[in-house]
Amino acid sequence: MEFNGNLNHMEKRKSGYVTQKQFNEYKDSNDQRLIKIETTLAAQGEQISQLVQIVFLQGKQIKELQAEQKAQRVEFNARMDRFESLVLKSLESIGNTLTDFGKRFDSMETRLDSMDGRLDSMETRLDKIDPPK
């Protein structure tokens, strides 16, 4: 059946017969829902586009941070190498100083042994000159 300008004209529907006016109201209601859905989808599409831009920006920032981190790691490693070198030089210097002190102590010990020997010799002479009573 077709619409012939009569608002009371009936059309066959699965749920029964409806008037053209009811059909148009239903159609208008559906059109409004579709418009609302389209508006919502458009807004969500815009939000998705904004989120994609944010993700791209964050990806760029991550790459920049990774490059900065790599540069800092290289600088840190260079500083650690320099620090290790300075520590090794300091330890070597301390070792040399301790070796020098050891040599000096050995020399002093030799001198003291020599002096002790001389004192023993002097005591022996004195004992010969003036024997103990």
From Swiss-Prot:
Pfam families: DUF16
Domain of life (superkingdom): Bacteria
Gene3D superfamilies from the UniProt entry: 6.10.250.40
Annotated SUPFAM superfamilies: MPN010-like (SSF144266)
InterPro entries per UniProt: DUF16
Family: Belongs to the UPF0134 family.
Name the record gives this protein: UPF0134 protein MPN_151
Organism: Mycoplasma pneumoniae (strain ATCC 29342 / M129 / Subtype 1)
